[in-house]
């Protein structure tokens, strides 16, 4: 931000799920809050996990590769709802610390969107209990 940036246009989060160490909710929360602190009140846009084509989540898919046009983006996340919920809950908690937007990759139809919003609603209920 010191060089005049107006925020973080796209923070890729997939690296947090590298084989051997998948960050839990608290670790993700701490990472996102550190990004928000570094942005000093400017908007941070986080892209949710985007596995497929050139990226895999080995622990979730047990080494199965996605095809180029098949299981990618939001559809990949929706196949692993527990991990998606962990990320969304961490993002929602972090959003209390600064301006944060969430971008779901490769939403192709209303079913993708509705399914993602069900996860968001689940996390909202969980965090307000």
Identify the residue ranges that each predicted region occupies.
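Conserved alpha/beta-domain cores
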Residues: 1-129
């Amino acid at each position: 931000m010191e060089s005049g940036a107006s925020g973080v246009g796209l923070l890729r989060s997939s690296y947090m799920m590298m084989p051997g160490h998948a960050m839990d909710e608290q670790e993700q929360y701490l990472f996102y809050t550190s990004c928000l602190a570094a942005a000093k009140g400017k908007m941070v846009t986080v892209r949710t996990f985007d596995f497929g084509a050139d990226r895999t989540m080995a622990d979730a898919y047990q080494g199965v590769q996605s095809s180029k046009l098949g299981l990618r983006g939001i559809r990949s996340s929706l196949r692993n709802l527990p991990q998606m919920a962990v990320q969304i809950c961490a993002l929602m908690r972090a959003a209390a610390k600064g301006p944060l937007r969430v971008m779901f990759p490769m939403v192709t139809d209303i079913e993708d969107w509705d399914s993602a919003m069900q996860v968001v609603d689940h996390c909202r209920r969980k965090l307000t209990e």
